[in-house]
């Protein structure tokens, strides 16, 4: 076994792609049922009215309407959908 690294050897050179998390739809934007609103790990943003949550904490719209972000009970962030009339 060599005690010196060979020429051109590198221990770097690997990286993983990003996981595309974050807010996908911002406040007062229009959405249709099924649109993904937030991709997250854990409940950084909690679901409000007309918003569902997947098993990976993804928040999605249950109805067509307008997105509304608000705060409740201290610093808890909530996203809701105001349905179109």
From Swiss-Prot:
One of its GO terms (molecular function) is structural constituent of ribosome. Transmembrane segments: none annotated. Gene3D superfamilies: 2.40.50.100. Residues 1-22 are annotated as: Disordered. Keywords: Ribonucleoprotein, Ribosomal protein. GO terms for cellular component: cytosolic large ribosomal subunit. GO terms for biological process: translation. It holds the Pfam family Ribosomal_L27. InterPro entries: Ribosomal_bL27. Belongs to the bacterial ribosomal protein bL27 family. NCBIfam families: L27. This is Large ribosomal subunit protein bL27.
């Amino acid at each position: 076994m060599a005690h010196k690294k060979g020429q051109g050897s590198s221990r770097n050179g690997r990286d993983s792609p990003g996981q595309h998390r974050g807010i996908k739809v911002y406040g007062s934007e229009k959405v249709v049922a099924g649109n993904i609103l937030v991709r997250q790990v854990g409940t950084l943003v909690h679901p409000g009215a007309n918003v569902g949550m997947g098993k990976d904490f993804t928040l999605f719209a249950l109805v067509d309407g307008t997105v509304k972000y608000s705060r409740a009970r201290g610093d808890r962030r909530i996203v809701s959908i105001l349905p179109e009339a």
